[in-house]
């Protein structure tokens, strides 16, 4: 197929799809409809379609031989819900045929011929029960399994035809109920012995019409197993050794504890579930110990609120950038709004206030700050700050209202080292900045923490100088109102 130069070639029509065999795809099976899927047990099913009839026969046959539904599910690779539904329907109706897909079942209407037969049976034998009439209808060939009325329908028709009193009806219903409980509806004696001969034509029909005709034991509720103290002790010792015992261990344990292997298996399953629940609760309790204050109670020292015990961090070297006064910036704590509003900015970073923050070993907290005034008078309205505070005022600020200090090692927070370090170089930095203040010589040996931040890791902008107003200690009362 040729095309002109510059023309856009048209797409060719795709050829019909080839029917290649589907192989190697784990979730799809080659079926005539192409809808095959594989369930979690590895069995093949078609969504929305009932199970094949031979599998239904096999389910009923295995249940007749006493195989448990869970074992049937694993061996035939059919879901447990499907097995239970088939067995329950067979127990109630004696049929393994699947129910109608969608909608409700059509109401079965008894024909007049069948009603006449039932009346004849009742006249010939007034003591005949409804289930006996139903079996005789099947035996005489009046009805087949698809058209035979139920026991309740036969009882209702006979009650309306013969018009017995209420007491007689109740007595009859009670006797029929007791008799039906004694023998199954579709037992060997009731069905196989009285089954009508099957013609060869019907044998050639579909396998759906053929029913297994096997009696199933009436499903009963099992009472809960009560274990003795010796049995529980034996089981607990085995659970301490392993949570998942194999079949040999379970059988040996069942012999020693005088239990069945199935009971041992169920006990281990329940015990594992209880163990997982307890383990989760213990982990939650361990985590809750960390929530109050974000620290366990054992880590908090028994000291006053604003005084922490001496820490045991290993001393490390401090970078030169921290020791250089020109490369350090001291982060202040928030101050009252009245003392924060300033009209002018400092001309250089050196004019900003230096703050020595007493901090604990767990980082910044709400402890009282000891403030150091700036090196130069940055606020002309308050020259007393530039000349230095009085020793009495500084004593109030540093002693926190009489709370005694304990000897501690000075530590500095540095973003470069990522930990608390001895602030020997930082103390020297603070002393260089405060050497011109004659009235603050006592602060060079005060036990305070100077958290420093290097400009190499943080961008600096001119910071407004934080000043105290004329009224002395009002800022101190604002910060710590609870300290007298």
Curated annotation (Swiss-Prot):
Transcription regulation is among the record's keywords: yes
Pfam families in the cross-refs: Homeodomain (PF00046), PAX (PF00292), Pax7 (PF12360)
Ranges of the DNA-binding region feature: 34-161, 220-279
Positions of region (RED subdomain): 113-161
Tissue: Expressed in the dorsolateral ectoderm during early and mid-gastrula stages. At late-gastrula and neurula stages, expressed in the lateral neural plate, becoming progressively refined to the neural folds during convergence and extension. Expression is also restricted in the A/P axis, extending into the midbrain but excluded from the forebrain.
UniProt keyword annotation of Nucleus present: yes
GO molecular function: DNA-binding transcription factor activity, RNA polymerase II-specific; RNA polymerase II cis-regulatory region sequence-specific DNA binding
Composition bias, Polar residues: 314-330
Biased composition (Low complexity): 343-353
Residue ranges, compositional bias (Basic and acidic residues): 172-196
Subcellular location as annotated: Nucleus
Assigned protein family: Belongs to the paired homeobox family.
PANTHER family: PAIRED BOX PROTEIN PAX-3, PAIRED BOX PROTEIN PAX-6-RELATED-RELATED
Identification of the protein by name: Paired box protein Pax-3-A
Originating species: Xenopus laevis (African clawed frog)
